[in-house]
């Protein structure tokens, strides 16, 4: 554990120094290719940093924050786009907005109108899920089918909400939420575009979808340009998830996750085309059941297979236990001495 924490300090120390360089040097360079060339060495470094970890909790977090989000932010920053514009007022804020999964809130937060019991309920489910993993063998298959997606959503939502709350206090500004109750999605377009992982969606839109659509509009009809933008975005998302799985498992990619996102890209594009031709006549509740059901089934077939085979959730639980034991020993030794 001590070696892993030393690696953590070195990796994130390197990240902070690199982002500080981006704040002082590339920001003074004219936007475009020259600024892009000045940030590319940092992007390459961020792709390497997760490989210094053994623990999945550190490698996956670093991959998500640096290899994916920070790299996209810096590439968009090179062209005066993305969440780093306008340039934060000081270095500390620039480091936070670059390295952490946060985005300055630009619109009123609709989640403020949610009942007060929603967050405590999620925390209670989070605690329950931490304990129910020990009884996985005893659970019926139909329950296990929904356990992985529920676990993924609740863990991410609770932890990222806590991070947002702390950084809202530290930075003294309102931050965008990461999720907008995705279980209420009435379509795949609603789920991926407006409810699930909004931080990533806000980066994919200017970073992948809009450029591809803009280029394709000169070659084909606007409908096909939208389709190409949609498919490219989902394909890139699939490759990025394959990269994260590689950082965690250090195994050859299976492309299962890529096919999951390609499938959802096709289905989302078809859904958008159908909605343009006709109006939905189904009730919102039925649409939610169909949408969530499709996500759960396809996720079980293509998305969560690698997680289950690699025992990632169990490994993370063991890593958390090791970390807690390490802290207890250090505190005990400190109090005794």
From Swiss-Prot:
Q: Provide one Gene Ontology cellular component.
A: membrane
Record InterPro entries: Wax_synthase, Wax_synthase_dom, Wax_synthase_Magnoliopsida
The enzyme class is transferase
Q: Does the keyword Transmembrane helix apply?
A: yes
Q: Which is an annotated GO molecular function term of this record?
A: long-chain-alcohol O-fatty-acyltransferase activity
Return the EC number: 2.3.1.75
Q: Name one Pfam family in it.
A: MBOAT_2
Q: Does the keyword Transcription regulation apply?
A: no
Which residue ranges traverse the bilayer?
A: 7-27, 38-58, 59-79, 82-102, 142-162, 228-248, 254-274, 285-305
Alphabetized, the UniProt keywords read: Acyltransferase, Lipid biosynthesis, Lipid metabolism, Membrane, Transferase, Transmembrane, Transmembrane helix
Q: Where in the cell is it found?
A: Membrane
Residues forming coiled coils: none
The record's catalysed reaction(s) read:
a long chain fatty alcohol + a fatty acyl-CoA = a wax ester + CoA
Topological type in the membrane: Multi-pass membrane protein
GO biological process: one example: lipid metabolic process
Sequence similarity: Belongs to the wax synthase family.
Q: What does this protein do?
A: Catalyzes the final step in the synthesis of long-chain linear esters (waxes).
User: What is the official name of this protein in its record?
Assistant: Putative long-chain-alcohol O-fatty-acyltransferase 10
